[in-house]
């Protein structure tokens, strides 16, 4: 039941305690008091006989020393060589964390730190557990932001050729990569730094085009003319993942009327031509009105024909919007008739600004009743739903806006060359007003898409682009995603919803810094030439020369005569190379094809921020499922964003931007920005709830530093008490240990198990909480406080001392390994200060926590926790006074609790028993019945303790009494316990130890 450690049960009643011998008072206590100077002299007399802790490991490192200490530790411990070492060792299992490539366009920031450190904690944990870790860092190197930044550094950039632009962009990306790489290494990130991947590497680009090739062959890639998100500021199409939304965008909304040309047949009796009649429409994008081709209604909704009190004309709008619209227009509506949306069929209107154009009334399911009038102006070139309606009804999709966001000549002289979001909008509103169609204009604040890089407003614009037909791969992707473990689970539905909304993916971009779409166009007809053979030919060239070849080589070397002939052409020179490049999400989304090894090419983990649910996670899934019908990952771990410590977005104007380099090395003014070192940054990451937004600032960093200093104090105590101890030769078997030492091993085993499980679940904040609780509650506050006497005052090689030293050695090893993935610098620093030669290879080359299952002893908690409950009662009864100045009597009724305490103290009274050590008293007496006489100055406390053994099969509640009274003994000048007969003479134990030292 309790294990072999427990003494045989003895339920006899002890003889009554000799009251006179213990409670005799005399004047001994007064005589024992000494002057401080005299006490100091006598203490110093025995100082050299006490085994005080000693270690060169600092309890706290001054901030100025922290960065250099970490760099020295990295060098001594071989941080840079660790990755290649673990790749070369024999390991049964492989663990692959595929690095989502950060964008190579700037300095490292705390978002990078959060992401890279989380990955490193994950990798180091798995490596220590015996896995062969595969982690190849990479960078996303193409795209508009890099191109624009590179060009901003060049005078006359507008005159550069595509080849020159590409060269400048590549050089810029390379510089950014070197900066970021140096920072990541400084943070202690373990990775294959010698073989990083970059999306501009020829082999990467070739593998990317191979994925494109397979998707094209399977029919997933096509060209079409339809509306896409368009960035006028960047002059290119963008995917939805490249948008960010401005919640405070101000649009110019208008209420306008479309005069009825043909009344819907079912409303002929109501709208008979006796009064002017129009449909009432609301839009936040007046500039799209010239492209209007129809007005849409919701078939199942109710609509009203109303008479306007101001003008007397008839207006049609949704019945649910009559009251609110009348209020906005500052008029009154008289409802003449109500009908269903389907009753509006076969009606048509006059275009409000273009004479002679007819806009039919058409049904559509995207019409909503929450705002506007329930009738939607439909411009197929500027809306996804509008385009679908137009396709269904064979309406034209004419785009009157050019790539820079200006009206084209086809829009008419009044609008030509005007910016649609600025003066173009104003011009259209004036045209509506001139035509008598404008009823109301007002500012409208709403969420609006912006280009994520230029930070300028987007528009939706029809253009000829290349697409991935995600509608055909979506169902398979959703099924594949259901087999993926996603942490936290709250991200599952969000990713599925984002995937469900995506019907197509625009993959073409009108820039030159990227991977070209391998397509050729007939000069005269514009007809595209692309097939399996032409793509394969381009891939061969790209693999050898890189994608620069697309711009530098003549078309004759890129397109074969055979391919032209097969397509029905006659001359290669009749064709031109396409000028579009692939979306950078397609670049990074095919990284699995280049980086992941083995036949399966599947990573164990992708770990990125929540913005990647619609970005890299999704693009990787779509490309992998389209070509292989499986996800490229087994687990997704999704973390939040970094914010200022008050929860606000970081901004230079606010002054709350945290620079990781300043965190580590300090700023110009160390009083304002002190150096913390990389481990503080790593602790901040680990202790945060990374599945929500992660806060950082001076208060957070100071708290992290203080937490590490507390941990250092705990480590220093253990290191300091290891002097002269060699675990290989001096360890005591658990069966021969003090029960409290066995109890600590039991707690160590439990701690190791819980920490391991927390790491497995990527719950690193739980690891930190477990670590702090174990070090503070179990070690510092409990175990260290009761074993100091054994450590300092017993003979150096006494088994009792060796017993707790054995536990300290095991605890140090378990604790250091448990936080090593989080604080690798501190972990290696501790191992470098071990006073014995143990694991000279360091922490990371010697495995994970080795907590023996033999340490687990169910039931042992009851003995120690029962004793601790009584100690708490005892300490509470003396109100913060020194427990060493008291003797304690514990009275327990016969039963399990009494048996457990007997295992800790076989004698009736003892100053050296295990129970007395826990009580921290001068002497402990254990009785099974209350003494007949109790001194008046005794403190008596009663309590109960519930014993729960064998998983609850054995339960017994026992009552106890704790009687505390001042001791009559003097303070020993050596051990400072009240166990001596005279304040000038050491206690019997200390005399024996001193005598032993003299004999040696």
Curated annotation (Swiss-Prot):
**What would be one Pfam family of this protein?**
Anticodon_1
Determine if Nucleotide-binding is one of this entry's keywords.
yes
Motif 'HIGH' region per UniProt: ranges: 102-112
Q: Where in the cell is it found?
A: Mitochondrion matrix
Under InterPro entries, the record lists:
aa-tRNA-synth_I_CS, aa-tRNA-synth_Ia, Anticodon_Ile_BEm, Ile-tRNA-ligase, Ile-tRNA-ligase_type1, Ile-tRNA_ligase, M/V/L/I-tRNA-synth_anticd-bd, Rossmann-like_a/b/a_fold
The main enzyme category here is ligase
Annotated Gene Ontology cellular components are:
mitochondrial matrix; mitochondrion
GO MF annotation list = aminoacyl-tRNA deacylase activity; ATP binding; isoleucine-tRNA ligase activity; tRNA binding
Q: Where is this motif: 'KMSKS' region?
A: 649-653
Q: Biological process GO annotation list?
A: isoleucyl-tRNA aminoacylation; mitochondrial translation
Binding-site list for ATP? 649, 652
Q: What is its EC number?
A: 6.1.1.5
Keywords attached to this Swiss-Prot or TrEMBL record, sorted alphabetically, are: Aminoacyl-tRNA synthetase, ATP-binding, Ligase, Mitochondrion, Nucleotide-binding, Protein biosynthesis, Transit peptide
Q: What catalytic activity does the UniProt entry give for this protein?
A: tRNA(Ile) + L-isoleucine + ATP = L-isoleucyl-tRNA(Ile) + AMP + diphosphate
Function in brief: Aminoacyl-tRNA synthetase that catalyzes the specific attachment of isoleucine to its cognate tRNA (tRNA(Ile)).
Q: What is the protein name for this chain?
A: Isoleucine--tRNA ligase, mitochondrial
- The organism of origin for this protein: Gallus gallus
* Protein's gene: IARS2
């Amino acid at each position: 039941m309790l294990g072999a450690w427990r003494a045989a049960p003895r339920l006899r009643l002890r003889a009554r305690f000799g009251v006179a011998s213990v409670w005799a008072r005399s004047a001994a206590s007064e005589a024992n008091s000494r002057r401080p100077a005299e006490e100091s002299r006598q203490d110093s007399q025995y100082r050299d006989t006490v085994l005080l802790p000693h270690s060169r490991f600092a309890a706290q490192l001054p901030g100025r020393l922290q960065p250099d200490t970490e760099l020295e530790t990295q060098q001594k411990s071989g941080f840079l060589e660790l990755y290649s070492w673990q790749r070369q060792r024999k390991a049964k299992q492989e663990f692959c964390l595929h690095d989502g490539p950060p964008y190579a366009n700037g300095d490292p920031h705390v978002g990078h730190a959060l992401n890279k450190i989380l990955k490193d904690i994950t990798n180091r944990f798995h490596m220590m557990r015996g896995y062969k870790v595969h982690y190849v860092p990479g960078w996303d190197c193409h795209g508009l932001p890099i191109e624009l930044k590179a060009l901003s550094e060049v005078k006359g950039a507008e005159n550069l050729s595509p080849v020159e632009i590409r060269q400048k962009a590549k050089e810029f990306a390379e510089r950014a990569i070197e900066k970021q790489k140096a920072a990541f290494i400084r943070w202690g990130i373990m990775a294959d730094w010698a073989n990083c991947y970059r999306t501009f590497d020829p082999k990467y680009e070739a593998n990317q085009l191979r994925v494109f090739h397979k998707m094209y062959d399977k029919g997933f890639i096509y060209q079409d003319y339809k509306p896409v998100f368009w960035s006028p500021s960047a002059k290119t199409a963008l995917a939805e993942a490249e948008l960010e939304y401005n919640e405070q965008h101000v649009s110019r909304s208008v209420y306008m009327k479309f005069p009825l040309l043909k009344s819907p047949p079912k409303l002929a009796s109501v709208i008979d031509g006796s009064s002017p009649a129009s449909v009432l429409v609301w839009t936040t994008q007046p500039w799209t009105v010239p492209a209007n081709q129809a007005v849409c209604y919701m078939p199942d909704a109710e609509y009203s024909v109303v008479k306007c009190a101001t003008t007397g004309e008839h207006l049609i709008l949704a019945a649910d919007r009559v009251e609110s619209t009348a209020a906005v227009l500052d008029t009154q509506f008289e409802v003449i008739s109500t009908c269903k949306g389907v009753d509006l069929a076969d009606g048509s209107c006059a275009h409000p600004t273009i004479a002679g154009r007819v806009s039919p009334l058409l049904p559509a399911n995207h019409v909503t009743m929450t705002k506007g009038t329930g009738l939607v102006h439909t411009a197929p070139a500027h809306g996804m739903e509008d385009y679908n309606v137009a396709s269904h009804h064979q309406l034209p999709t004419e785009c009157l806006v050019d790539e820079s966001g200006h009206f084209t000549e086809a829009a008419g002289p009044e609008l030509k060359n005007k910016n649609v979001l600025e003066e173009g909008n104003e011009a259209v509103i004036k045209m509506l007003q001139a035509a008598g169609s404008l009823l109301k204009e007002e500012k409208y604040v709403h969420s609006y898409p912006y280009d994520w890089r230029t930070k300028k407003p987007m528009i939706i614009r029809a253009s000829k682009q290349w697409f991935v037909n995600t509608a055909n791969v979506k169902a398979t992707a959703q099924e594949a995603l259901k087999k993926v473990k996603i942490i936290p689970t709250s991200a599952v539905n969000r990713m599925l919803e984002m995937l469900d909304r995506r019907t197509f993916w625009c993959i073409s971009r009108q820039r030159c810094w990227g991977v070209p779409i391998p397509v050729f166009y007939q000069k005269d007809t514009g007809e595209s030439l692309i097939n399996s053979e032409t793509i394969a030919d381009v891939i061969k060239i790209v693999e050898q020369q890189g994608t620069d070849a697309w711009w530098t080589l003549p078309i004759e070397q890129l397109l074969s005569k055979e391919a032209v002939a097969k397509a029905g052409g006659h001359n290669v020179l009749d064709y031109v190379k396409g000028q579009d490049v692939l979306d950078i999400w397609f670049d990074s989304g095919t990284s699995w094809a280049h980086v992941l090894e083995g036949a399966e090419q599947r990573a164990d983990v992708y770990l990125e921020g929540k913005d990647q649910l619609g970005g890299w996670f999704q693009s990787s899934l779509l490309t992998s499922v389209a070509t292989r019908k499986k996800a490229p990952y087994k687990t997704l771990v999704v973390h939040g964003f970094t914010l200022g410590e008050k929860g606000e977005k970081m901004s230079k104007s606010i002054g709350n931007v945290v620079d990781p380099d300043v965190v580590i090395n300090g700023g110009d003014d160390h009083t304002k920005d002190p150096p913390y070192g990389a481990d503080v940054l790593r602790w901040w990451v680990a202790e945060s709830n990374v599945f929500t937004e992660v806060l950082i600032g001076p208060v957070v960093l100071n708290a992290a530093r203080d937490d590490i200093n507390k941990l250092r104090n705990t480590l220093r105590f253990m290191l300091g008490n290891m002097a002269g101890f060699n675990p290989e030769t001096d360890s005591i078997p658990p069966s021969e240990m003090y029960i409290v030492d066995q109890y600590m091993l039991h707690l160590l085993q439990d701690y190791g198990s819980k920490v391991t499980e927390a790491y497995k679940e990527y719950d690193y904040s739980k690891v930190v909480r477990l670590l702090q609780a174990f070090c503070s509650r179990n070690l510092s506050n409990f175990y260290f406080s009761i074993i100091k006497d054994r450590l300092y005052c017993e003979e150096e090689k006494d088994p009792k001392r060796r017993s707790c030293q054995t536990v300290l050695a095991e605890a140090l090893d378990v604790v250091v390994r448990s936080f090593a993935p989080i604080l690798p610098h501190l972990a290696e620093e501790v191992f470098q200060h071990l006073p014995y030669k143990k694991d000279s290879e360091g922490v990371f080359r010697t495995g994970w926590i080795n907590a023996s299952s033999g340490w687990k002893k169910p039931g042992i908690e009851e003995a120690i926790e029962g004793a601790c409950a009584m100690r708490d009662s005892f300490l509470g009864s003396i109100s913060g006074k020194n427990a060493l100045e008291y003797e304690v009597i514990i009275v327990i009724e016969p039963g399990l609790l009494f048996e457990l305490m007997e295992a800790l103290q076989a004698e009736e009274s003892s100053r050296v028993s295990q129970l007395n050590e826990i009580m921290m008293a001068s002497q402990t007496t254990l009785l099974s019945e209350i003494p007949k006489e109790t001194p008046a100055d005794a403190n008596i406390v009663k309590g109960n303790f519930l014993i729960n053994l064998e998983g609850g099969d054995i339960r017994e509640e026992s009552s106890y009494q704790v009687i505390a009274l001042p001791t009559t003994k003097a303070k020993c000048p050596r051990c400072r316990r009240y166990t001596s007969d005279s304040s000038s003479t050491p206690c019997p134990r200390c005399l024996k130890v001193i005598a032993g030292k003299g004999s040696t």
